[in-house]
């Protein structure tokens, strides 16, 4: 008020989006972002209005010449009603012109002088640095948000084990490193993952992308939950010590840290195996409305190294909802974790809702309009593969049983209406059962699952995995597994506490 009666700030939309401003010309449209007037003086253009400056006007000359313009006496030509003296100064920072600020005198009789122009230029220079910092933050925030959204799941994977819904909300302070995933596994199982990388911005989003990719790769190897977290822990430790991307692109980003919760659900046994690395406890909402927070060993956050991860196994009723989330859902500056968990329990206690409805109810009840920390939420309602979709046989370690196994398998395929897959399945059963009897010890089990694909599994007590190779012309064996791999859509090995399982998948014929 002691300097000007009216002050206005105009910026191009590109600056408001965080982009580099284009060169200014007569057609450049600006957005009025700030107005301050002494008293109740009416103004023709308020905040949010678009303005264009006439060629030759003080503002236009200011932007073209990138110099402050002093108009001591306007003689009624001022852009604001009643203005008689004007100073316009470009907002320049780091070599770029970001906009213009105009100071008007309407009520004060004294015109602006050269000393006033110097003061206005000093004020504008300081303000321009703040505007450019905000522009750069907006650009980084937008880039990080775009990167994170591109790294998060875009759709629901093709699996039958759970009905899933999820949400991600960025933080008010900036994009963080929260992520979630639903990953189909062999044997009709599914992996559910939620994680949280420490920090905000591009570094957190990029680190999240690396960890999410690593989890997918480890899942493809059919690692156990505790082994998967051990490998992920080692990866975070290497990032923390500045290997690869971290050393080249984020030398001053600080310590890399992350938490993670990893669960595997089997729709045949209804068993769910969970492990966590410093992550909040998951909740299980039963179909009857009961809610429990799973008592999981905490495990250290990822990156500390040297500590084993422990698992907990649950049997879930069909229709149970497994709720995984990051700490931003239950904790903020005004609420401790216990209060957040109790509120979450109350929200989940209402039965009969689909996962999408649960997500909406949880976010509405738990979060303000703009959370201080980013939030990832994953809700998975369990399904079950019924007895009519599963067939299994325990086989003695006798080569004579192979033909009986083939007959049993083709008979079950006929009952399922899958005769088109009988020939390939006979070959798969013959090869896998024969190898198990020949090379493994202990009992052999054959299992067929009719899910979105026909799954054939043969388990035995040996820990060694078969190796796919191309047999030489003089070799008497070694071709069976190669044929299995060529005739089926997918195959692999997963280890169990008692040995291993060799599995194959075939697409079901279209109806």
Regions found by a protein language model. Give the residues of each.
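Catalytic core of PPM/PP2C metal-dependent serine/threonine phosphatase domains
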Residues: 143-165, 205-300, 309, 313, ...
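Acidic loop->beta-strand submotif enriched in PP2C/PPM serine/threonine phosphatases
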Residues: 173-177, 257-260, 292-334, 443-447
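GAF sensory/regulatory domain recognition
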Residues: 2-51
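Primarily the active-site beta-strand->alpha-helix module of PP2C/PPM metal-dependent phosphatases
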Residues: 113, 175-246, 250-254, 323, ...
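Conserved beta-strand-loop-beta-strand hairpin that lines the nucleotide-binding pocket
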Residues: 437-511
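Active-site-proximal, acidic helix/loop segment immediately C-terminal to a metal-coordinating Asp/Glu
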Residues: 201-222, 298, 316, 320-366, ...
């Amino acid at each position: 008020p002691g300097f000007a009666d009216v002050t206005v700030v105009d910026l191009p939309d590109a600056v408001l989006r965080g982009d580099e401003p284009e060169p200014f010309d007569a057609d450049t449209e600006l957005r009025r972002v700030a107005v301050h007037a002494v008293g109740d003086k009416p103004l023709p253009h308020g905040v949010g209005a678009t303005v264009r400056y006439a060629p030759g006007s003080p503002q236009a000359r200011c932007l073209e010449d990138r110099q402050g313009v002093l108009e001591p006496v306007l003689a009624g030509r001022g852009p604001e009603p009643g203005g008689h003296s004007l100073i316009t100064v470009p907002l320049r920072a780091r070599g770029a012109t970001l906009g213009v600020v105009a100071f008007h005198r309407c009520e004060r009789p004294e015109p602006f002088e050269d000393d006033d122009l110097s003061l206005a230029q000093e004020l504008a220079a300081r303000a321009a640095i703040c505007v450019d910092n905000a522009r750069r933050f907006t650009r980084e925030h937008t880039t990080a948000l775009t990167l994170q959204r591109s790294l998060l799941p875009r759709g629901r994977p093709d699996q039958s084990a759970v009905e899933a819904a999820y949400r991600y909300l960025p933080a008010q302070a900036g994009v963080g490193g929260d992520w979630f995933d639903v990953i189909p596994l062999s044997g009709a199982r599914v992996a559910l993952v939620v994680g949280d990388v420490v920090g905000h911005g591009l570094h957190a989003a990029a680190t999240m992308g690396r960890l999410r990719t690593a989890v997918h790769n480890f899942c493809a190897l059919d690692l156990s939950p505790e082994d998967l977290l051990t490998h992920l822990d080692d990866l975070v430790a290497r990032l923390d010590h500045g290997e690869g991307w971290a050393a080249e692109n984020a030398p001053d980003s600080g310590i890399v840290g992350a938490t993670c919760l990893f669960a595997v659900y089997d729709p045949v046994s209804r068993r769910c195996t969970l492990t966590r690395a410093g992550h909040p406890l998951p909740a299980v909402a039963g179909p009857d409305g009961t809610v429990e927070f799973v008592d999981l060993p905490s495990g250290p956050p990822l990156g500390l190294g040297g500590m084993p991860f422990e698992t907990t196994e649950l049997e879930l009723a069909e229709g149970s909802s497994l709720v995984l989330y990051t700490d931003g859902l239950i904790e903020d500056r005004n609420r401790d974790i216990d209060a957040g968990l109790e509120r979450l329990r109350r929200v989940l206690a209402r039965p009969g809702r689909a996962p999408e409805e649960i997500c909406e109810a949880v976010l509405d009840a738990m979060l303000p309009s703009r959370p201080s920390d980013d939030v990832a939420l994953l809700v998975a309602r369990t399904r079950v593969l019924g007895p009519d979709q599963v067939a299994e046989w325990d086989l003695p370690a006798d080569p004579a049983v192979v033909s009986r196994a083939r007959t049993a398998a083709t008979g079950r395929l006929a009952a399922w209406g899958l005769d088109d897959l009988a020939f390939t399945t006979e070959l798969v059963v013959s090869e896998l059962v024969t190898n198990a009897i020949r090379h493994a010890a202990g009992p052999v089990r054959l299992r067929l699952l009719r899910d979105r694909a026909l799954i054939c599994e043969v388990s035995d007590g040996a820990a060694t995995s078969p190796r796919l190779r191309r047999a030489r012309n003089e070799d008497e064996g070694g071709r069976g597994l190669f044929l299995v791999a060529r005739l089926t859509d997918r195959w692999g090995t997963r280890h169990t506490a008692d040995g291993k399982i060799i599995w194959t998948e075939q697409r079901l014929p279209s109806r």
